[in-house]
């Protein structure tokens, strides 16, 4: 399940009128229908062949740009797009090693290299916004993409919950974004219990796939 390989299928974005059919617009880069935007050129969203030969700083920039280019494909609703934007900014600035230690204090395995984790995370989100042209011919990959989409939705829901907690009390940023105190099982505050349980599950998921969601 969830093989993290670059999906060979089209990258799409769900549109707003699921009952209408037929192509509405065709351009050199996309075919737009009432249900989907099918991108015929995936190049802007994929890492270039020179990625491995690039310096680390340039690799970070390449990853960052591609995560942000996926914003229109993640969701149509402005609120979800905003949460995705905040989520990506946080992921590129957080102290993931500290966050992981708070959530999994008994785990002594080294943290996967951030660039490799970023590459795998990009592939994961690419799968989440992808559809198989003929799902019946490859049901396993279609199901994998569906699972990625559901997980990404849950991740963005958690991000929205963090934003709401911070909005109500800006001082919570230290707990949620800096020292990650809420992830400590000994931190007893019911406001953070469901968020902590969900985030710990995601960190366990990252341990399995080598992602950094």
Curated annotation (Swiss-Prot):
Any one of the GO BP annotations: mitotic recombination
Alphabetically ordered keywords of this record: Sporulation
Presence of keyword Translocase: no
Role noted for this protein: Involved in sporulation and maintenance of the mitochondrial DNA. Is probably involved in a pathway contributing to genomic integrity.
InterPro entries: Irc19
Organism of origin: Eremothecium gossypii (strain ATCC 10895 / CBS 109.51 / FGSC 9923 / NRRL Y-1056)
Family: Belongs to the IRC19 family.
Listed name of the protein: Increased recombination centers protein 19
Nucleus is among the record's keywords: no
Domain of life: Eukaryota
């Amino acid at each position: 399940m969830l093989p993290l390989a670059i999906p060979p299928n089209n990258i799409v974005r769900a549109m707003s009128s699921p009952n209408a059919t037929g192509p509405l617009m065709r351009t050199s880069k996309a075919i737009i229908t009432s249900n989907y935007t099918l991108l015929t050129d995936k190049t802007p969203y994929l890492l270039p062949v020179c990625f491995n030969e690039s310096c680390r700083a340039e690799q970070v920039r390449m990853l960052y740009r591609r995560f942000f280019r996926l914003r229109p494909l993640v969701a149509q609703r402005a609120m979800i797009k905003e949460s995705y934007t905040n989520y990506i900014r946080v992921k590129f600035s957080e102290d993931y090693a500290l966050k992981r230690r708070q959530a999994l204090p008994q785990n002594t395995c080294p943290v996967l290299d951030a660039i490799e984790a970023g590459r795998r995370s990009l592939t994961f989100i690419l799968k989440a916004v992808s559809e198989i042209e003929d799902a019946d011919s490859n049901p396993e990959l279609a199901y994998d993409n569906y699972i990625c989409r559901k997980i990404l939705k849950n991740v963005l829901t958690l991000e929205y919950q963090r934003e709401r907690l911070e909005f109500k009390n800006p001082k919570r940023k230290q707990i949620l974004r800096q020292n990650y105190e809420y992830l400590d099982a000994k931190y007893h505050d019911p406001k953070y219990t469901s968020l902590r349980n969900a985030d710990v599950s995601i960190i366990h998921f990252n341990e399995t796939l080598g992602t950094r969601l």
